[in-house]
């Protein structure tokens, strides 16, 4: 396992981050959950943790409650890095407000059964809200000792820049992390467009049009926590570029909406070619491509079997040449 450091956090952070929005973990906190459901969730988390993955991605509406129970049962909170998110819109309104930021963070602390969140992110942004209000609210949580570091998920780099300029001007702590979509697959449509009814849409830094975004991250050193790094199963190997229509049987609606397009099918075809040449799996090639980028970067994924977990870890050691990296991304 490879680890990195981020400013403000003493713990090592695994470059593979386990995404907790996965069926076994949802089942464990469902109203009809059984003891067996909890045991299955704990077993998955045990396997992830024993493999060296110590960083877990949660949010106000997934992962927190079961993570809190598991860490309490295993007495390993100090060994885990918890990334969680708040201020996601609901069906009625935008929730990127100082009230909701503070409220969600305090709720998260209770569900996680902890007194401090390692990495706290806002799940969405809203340009209707002055950035100063947001920075002040996050700094209040920081000064109260409730969060160690913070940033934004689905924030543009320009908005992060604005936030950090405000922080510098007012002697406050800046954003040090960001979680946009990033991976080999180009995100061609907002997978959760309904969520953008009140807040800003999802943010991706994938594809040729986002080169300036990636350059900014490389230059600033702000760590990227890349969500949907394998495009919600597009590079799972469960379907091939020869029969791409099989994706409709494998992927959910968000995955199809976000990633099913001719250019990504071609990227999949090229992954398949390299996977055969190197004797590895398609998902490993796609992950290796991510880790070949010139950014401080961690990749979020939600493997559900021991084999998938260790395949992902092995992908970190798979080296791609400069030409292979370009070729996979359709830069011929």
Language-model segments: residues:
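N-terminal binding-site loop/beta-alpha segment at the start of enzyme catalytic domains
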Residues: 1-80, 143
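Active-site mouth loops of central-metabolism enzymes
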Residues: 23-39, 86-100, 123, 127-128
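Short, acidic/polar
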Residues: 33-47, 96-112, 161-165
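Short catalytic-loop micro-motif centered on adjacent basic/acidic residues
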Residues: 54-59, 121-122, 148-153, 179
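Acidic-and-aromatic substrate-binding clefts and catalytic sites of carbohydrate-active enzymes
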Residues: 57-66, 89-95, 125-130, 157-160, ...
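A short, structured active-site edge motif that brings together acidic residues
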Residues: 78-92, 178-182
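Active-site groove signature of glycoside hydrolases
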Residues: 109-130
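Beta/alpha (TIM)-barrel catalytic core signal, keyed to glycine-rich beta->alpha loops juxtaposed to Asp/Glu
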Residues: 130-332
């Amino acid at each position: 396992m490879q680890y990195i450091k981020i400013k403000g956090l003493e713990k090592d952070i695994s470059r593979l981050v386990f995404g907790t929005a996965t069926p076994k973990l949802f089942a464990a906190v469902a109203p009809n959950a059984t003891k067996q459901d909890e045991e299955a969730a704990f077993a998955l988390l045990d396997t992830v943790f024993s493999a060296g993955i110590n960083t877990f991605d949660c949010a106000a509406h997934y992962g927190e409650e079961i993570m809190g129970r598991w860490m309490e049962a295993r007495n390993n909170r100090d060994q885990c890095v918890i990334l969680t998110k708040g201020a996601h819109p609901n069906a009625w309104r935008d929730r990127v407000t100082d009230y909701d930021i503070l409220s969600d963070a305090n709720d998260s602390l209770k569900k996680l059964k902890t007194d401090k969140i390692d990495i706290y992110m806002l799940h969405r942004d809203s340009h209707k809200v002055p950035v100063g209000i947001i920075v002040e609210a996050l700094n209040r949580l920081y000064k109260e000792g409730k969060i160690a570091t913070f940033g934004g998920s689905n924030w543009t780099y320009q908005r992060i820049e604005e936030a950090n300029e405000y922080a510098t001007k007012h002697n406050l702590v800046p954003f040090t992390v960001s979680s946009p979509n990033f991976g080999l697959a180009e995100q061609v449509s907002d997978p959760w467009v309904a969520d953008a009814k009140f807040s800003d849409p999802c943010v991706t830094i994938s594809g040729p049009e986002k080169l300036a975004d990636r350059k900014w991250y490389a230059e600033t050193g702000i760590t990227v926590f890349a969500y949907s790094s394998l495009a919600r199963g597009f590079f799972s190997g469960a379907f091939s570029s020869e029969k791409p229509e099989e994706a409709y049987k494998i992927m959910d609606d968000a995955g199809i909406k976000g990633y099913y397009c001719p250019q990504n099918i071609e990227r999949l075809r090229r992954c398949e070619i390299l996977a055969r040449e190197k004797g590895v799996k398609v998902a490993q090639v796609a992950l290796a491509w991510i880790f070949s980028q010139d950014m401080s970067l961690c990749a979020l994924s939600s493997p559900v079997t021991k084999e998938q977990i260790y395949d992902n870890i092995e992908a970190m050691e798979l080296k791609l040449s400069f030409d292979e990296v370009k070729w996979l991304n359709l830069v011929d």
